[in-house]
Amino acid sequence: MTGDTKHLPLEDIHVAAGARFGAFAGWSMPLTYPAGVMKEHLHAREHAGLFDISHMKLFKVSGPQAAALLNRACPLDAGALETAQSKLTFFLNEEAGIMDDLIVTRLGDTSFMVVANAGNAVADEKHLRTLASAFDVVVEPLERVFLAIQGPEAWAVLGRAGIETGSLLFMHGIEPRKDWFMSRSGYTGEDGFEIGLPEADARALVAKL
């Protein structure tokens, strides 16, 4: 894979683990490891699994009209969200067609985190910035490693790594440390957490896990 293919910040860790890579949404992504897909699947279902989802995009939306912007962009009453509450929603076009599904989390009175999919990240940012021009807001794309720790033992695994998760409810998200975003969410059907954090912190966390 050459040309404009994007690479994960932690690609070297995947290479060292024996990953086989394939193309997905313009990214070179680890698809399989020597243990095999079935063992990985069962381990995540029965214990916990670590997934690198850094191809997904985080946007921080802040300012006096942050909620109003998200109300305009999504079928969502952003102002009704409680602090730390997350909501699955969509970006809609002018014909009310779905552009992308995403999760919006309220971080504070005037700030929100938006997690969008890799395949639509560029279009999502363009759409959000176009709408934002009519509002008193700042749209900030974040350069973060994004990790998902999923499975019934995810909370215990993170606890052993020094990350407290017990007070974080499902479909809620917080900023537990400087430049970190952590939510209790995922797409595996099990309990789990998603953490966006700087590369240096991510490498330290992966080493502990």
Which sequence ranges carry the predicted segments?
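Basic, glycine/lysine-rich polyanion-binding surfaces/domains
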Residues: M1-L209
